[in-house]
């Protein structure tokens, strides 16, 4: 199910693979997980930021947005990751602030923020006799909740050959390579399979059913399409199936329905079918 992945270009921050023996439904959900589900750290301008500013042109809200936009090149953690910016401009000229003016700490201990070159906190000039002091604590989140947590990009293109794709991942965070992101996306997909299986296990108890409707959270429509495709194409189960389709999303419902119909003389019940399909995806 995972296909054959061969690296065409392999850089620290971007990798391109030639992917064979899989299907667009699979590479598409891997792409979606990378764009939506991979967690990272970001500063929060709400209850995690304390700003003491004197004689500044910018408002505190504007300052908070500039700090919030700083990329954090440190793995997501539940420990306290903090930035402190405390500067007084005693010169006669305006001073533009960078990450070199900041101190980064993890649980109170100074850490390297891993910026190759100082990252400009722009536009945030500090004029003569102006002072700024900011203390901000990072929070962990996912891109699907807020774009500031996005830690990379990913996409794919189909080749002329059937089910052959050029798939690429670009990392925006220095603590992880594209290959790390691919591995993490696959682990998240495994978790999605198991969480969904647990949510529908009660629906699968009746071994005599010849048709069944299984709900999937409507935010997981790509997952639903992947399951539908595998049910129809998996050689271990497709001979047992007459029909399988995803019903259109009803805006009044919170789920997508996967409708499955199996053959009357089938020796495999729905519980076995779904289990085989999910194991094939992983």
Where are each of the predicted segments found?
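Protein-protein interaction/assembly regions in multi-subunit complexes
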Residues: 1-282
């Amino acid at each position: 199910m995972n296909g054959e992945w061969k690296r065409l270009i392999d850089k620290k921050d971007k990798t391109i693979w030639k992917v064979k023996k899989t299907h667009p439904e699979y590479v598409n959900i891997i792409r979606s997980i990378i764009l939506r589900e991979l967690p990272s750290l970001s500063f929060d301008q709400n209850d995690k930021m304390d700003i003491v500013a004197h004689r500044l042109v910018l408002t505190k809200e504007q300052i908070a947005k500039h700090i919030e936009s700083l990329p954090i090149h440190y793995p997501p953690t539940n420990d306290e990751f903090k930035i402190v910016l405390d500067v007084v401009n005693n010169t006669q000229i305006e001073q533009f602030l960078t990450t070199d003016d900041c101190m980064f700490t993890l649980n109170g201990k100074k850490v390297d923020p891993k910026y190759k070159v100082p990252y400009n906190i722009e536009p945030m000039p500090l004029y003569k006799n102006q002072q700024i002091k900011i203390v901000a604590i990072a929070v962990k989140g996912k891109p699907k909740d807020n774009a500031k947590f996005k830690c990379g990009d990913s996409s794919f293109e189909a080749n002329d050959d059937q089910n052959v794709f050029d798939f690429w991942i670009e990392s925006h965070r220095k603590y992880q390579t594209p290959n790390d992101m691919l591995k993490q996306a696959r682990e998240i997909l495994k978790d999605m399979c198991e969480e969904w299986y647990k949510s529908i296990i009660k629906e699968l108890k009746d071994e005599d059913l010849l048709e069944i409707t299984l709900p999937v959270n409507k935010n997981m429509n790509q997952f639903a399409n992947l399951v539908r495709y595998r049910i129809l194409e998996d050689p271990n189960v497709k001979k047992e199936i007459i029909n399988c389709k995803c019903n259109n999303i009803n805006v009044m419902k919170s789920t997508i329905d996967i409708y499955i119909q199996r053959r009357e003389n089938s020796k495999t019940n729905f519980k076995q079918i779904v289990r085989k399909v999910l194991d094939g995806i992983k």
